[in-house]
Curated annotation (Swiss-Prot):
Organism name: Caenorhabditis elegans
Descriptive protein name: Uncharacterized protein F44E2.8
Region (Disordered): 1-27
SUPFAM superfamilies in alphabetical order: YbiA-like (SSF143990)
Xref: InterPro entries: NADAR (IPR012816), YbiA-like_sf (IPR037238)
């Protein structure tokens, strides 16, 4: 069965005009207008998943078990965290502002609170946006893969739910993020899926900082969190069948 791969247009910066022009001006300004797309080299081991409405799982927000904001106890290196987001933000602060700042997050009970607290701490410490962005580019993927694996490996109910998604494409539908999410809401992303039925998404099997540039465009974003979840799913499946 031949399927045309999408999400790998000619290399370069690609403008997400179609969505931005349909949004209120305030929302359109909340995310980048361009997403970097680089063709996937043939020497990088890859996988391909068919695009179809029944082969996609959309997720967003603290009520969805796939979200980093979902309240869930995770133990990493002997330390307990209330969610993936708690660990992610703690790692960010540890590197950028030090151990004491990271420890302050223990007072933040919910993932939303921990995001706000981190933002305030970084602002008070006068950490420039460029430095925060550099941490994200260098460390965020490894941090997320590590904690997300622990999240599902330690919680049997969540692990079963993740494995039950089979080989479906997991897409974070958040309009304000074209890196970790699709840069679009569920309605728009669903329309994008409908337009690309009988095509496929080809992506690097191992999602690491060196090949994130090769991830295909999903709606208007890179959907990095979705691809990380799919890799964790593959790893858990392999361990379960071993």
């Amino acid at each position: 069965m031949n399927k045309k791969s999408v999400g790998q247009p000619p290399e370069g910066l690609h403008e997400t005009k179609s969505l931005a022009s349909a949004l209120p001006e305030k929302n359109a300004e909340q995310r980048p207008k361009y997403v970097q797309i680089v063709a996937l080299p043939s020497e990088i081991k890859s996988r391909e998943l068919p695009i179809a409405p029944d082969n996609v799982v959309y997720f967003n927000g603290p009520t969805h078990y796939l979200s980093a904001l979902y309240p869930c106890t995770v133990v990493v290196d002997g330390n307990e965290y209330n969610s993936v987001e708690h660990y992610y933000q703690a790692c960010k602060l540890y590197v950028l502002t030090g151990e004491q700042s990271a420890a302050q997050l223990k007072a933040s009970e919910t993932p939303i609170e921990v995001k706000k607290a981190t933002k305030n701490i970084l602002k008070e410490a006068k950490i420039p946006a460029k430095k925060i962005s550099a941490w994200k580019d260098k460390d965020s993927i490894a941090v997320l893969k590590h904690v997300i694996y622990h999240k599902f490996n330690q919680n049997d109910e969540l692990k079963v739910k993740l494995l039950d998604t089979g080989d479906k494409i997991l897409i974070q539908t958040y309009i304000g993020d074209t890196y970790f999410a699709a840069g679009a809401n569920a309605k728009y992303t669903s329309t994008w899926v409908d337009r690309h039925v009988n095509q496929s998404l080809k992506y690097p099997e191992n999602v690491v900082v060196d090949n994130v540039q090769y991830l295909p465009l999903v709606a208007n974003g890179k959907n990095v969190l979705g691809w990380i979840l799919m890799q964790v799913r593959d790893e858990l499946r392999m361990r379960s069948s071993a």
